[in-house]
Amino acid sequence: MKIKIIFSYDGTAFLGSATQPHKKGVQDALSGALSHLGIFSPLLMASRTDKGVHASYAVASVECGDYFTNLEYLQKQLNKFSHPFIHIKKIEKVKDDFEVRFDVKSREYRYIFSHSSYSPFMASYVHFYPKFDLDKANELLGFFVGKKDLKFFCKSGGDNKTTLREIFIARAYAYKDFSIFHFKANGFLRGQIRLSVASVLKVLEGKMSEKELKEQIEAKKQYNHFLAPPNGLYLSRICY
């Protein structure tokens, strides 16, 4: 029997979502929790995130015995071994041919800025940043929407066969004392969102022109090589 696990995690506790040499990845921790329940099949993840990046909605799949008929009980037991940095939201039975990574239709991320006074208790979960022109940020983010070759918005080391991506949503909105950048696409390159966020901030700061941002999006020339900090970034949705 194959199951789909929907979960969230605190990225500060891990070196990234993928398995790591010293077993410090989200995948390692969740696999370890499953092993306590007698499930030793390879755990597959729908998305990868870097060190310090969080997820409010992540998905994994694993093969388990047919005797796990009570999935709510399995969820409860799995949470015992996953807490405090991973929380299992739901477990569903899926078809045997379900591909947790390749069946994905879209992924969504949110990048959170706080404009309030700095707090060390929040520093790992938001990017503290002065207030900016939200309307202007929306205009700049709009440049990303559509089918793009984002080769200049990609960290090295990825396993992508192509740098072409279709961005469905790239927008900014306010919530209380936060500003949030929301991205939705058919897929993302390694470091794409953090490079995109940093590039938009550079334009807002007057350190990069709109023309230069457009040229980087159009794959003509790379003007920004810097990434926004990982702590403000959240994987927020995966749709099949």
UniProtKB/Swiss-Prot annotation:
Q: Sorted alphabetically, which keywords does the UniProt record give?
A: Isomerase, tRNA processing
Query: Gene3D superfamilies this protein is in?
Result: Pseudouridine synthase I, catalytic domain, C-terminal subdomain, Pseudouridine synthase I, catalytic domain, N-terminal subdomain
Pfam families for this protein: PseudoU_synth_1 (PF01416)
Q: Which GO terms describe its biological process?
A: tRNA pseudouridine synthesis
Q: Which reaction does it catalyse?
A: uridine(38/39/40) in tRNA = pseudouridine(38/39/40) in tRNA
Per its UniProt record, what SUPFAM superfamilies does this chain match?
Pseudouridine synthase
Entry annotated with the keyword Kinase: no
Taxonomic superkingdom? Bacteria
Q: Locate the residues binding substrate.
A: 109
Top class in the EC scheme: isomerase
Q: Which EC number(s) are documented for this chain?
A: 5.4.99.12
Active-site residues from the entry: 50 (nucleophile)
Question: GO molecular function: any one?
Answer: tRNA pseudouridine(38-40) synthase activity
Q: What PANTHER family does its record include?
A: PSEUDOURIDYLATE SYNTHASE, TRNA PSEUDOURIDINE SYNTHASE-LIKE 1
Q: What does this protein do?
A: Formation of pseudouridine at positions 38, 39 and 40 in the anticodon stem and loop of transfer RNAs.
Membership in a protein family: Belongs to the tRNA pseudouridine synthase TruA family.
The record's note on quaternary structure and interaction partners says:
Homodimer.
Q: Which NCBIfam families match?
A: hisT_truA
UniProt name for this protein: tRNA pseudouridine synthase A
Q: Look up and give the organism this protein is from.
A: Campylobacter jejuni (strain RM1221)
The gene behind this protein is truA
